[in-house]
Amino acid sequence: MATAYQPMKPGKAGLEEPLEQIHKIRITLSSKNVKNLEKVCTDLVRGAKDKRLRVKGPVRMPTKVLKITTRKAPCGEGTNTWDRFELRVHKRVIDLFSSPDVVKQITSITIEPGVEVEVTIADS
């Protein structure tokens, strides 16, 4: 009675074909200008989908509002009048699953002025 199961022969160590390792790449974008930030986000996601990568995001993080209140008068006299200044920092997070070489091609797009980009690579 012949069996269809045949044991595999052990191959030599180090001669296996190297598989392209998939990494989880997190791209964090932050800016004071929402329009520029959204434009860079859409360009990144479009480029990743053209390369047929798995994309999560853009995830909109809470806007940080930094407020400073100061007196208008330089000296201590006069009516107490106050100036209120605020700075809004918007943040987006995009997760890609691919090799670092492909991400380098995707992130070579033109980034709008005022948009900060942070790329973190982790094993998935």
UniProtKB/Swiss-Prot annotation:
GO biological process terms, semicolon-separated: translation
Domain of life: Eukaryota
Pfam families according to UniProt: Ribosomal_S10
Keyword Ribosomal protein: yes
Record keywords, A-Z: Ribonucleoprotein, Ribosomal protein
Gene3D superfamilies: Ribosomal protein S10 domain
GO cellular component: cytosol; cytosolic small ribosomal subunit; plant-type cell wall; plastid
Single GO MF annotation: structural constituent of ribosome
PANTHER family for the chain: 30S RIBOSOMAL PROTEIN S10 FAMILY MEMBER
Family designation: Belongs to the universal ribosomal protein uS10 family.
Xref: HAMAP family: Ribosomal_uS10 (MF_00508)
Protein name: Small ribosomal subunit protein uS10z/uS10x
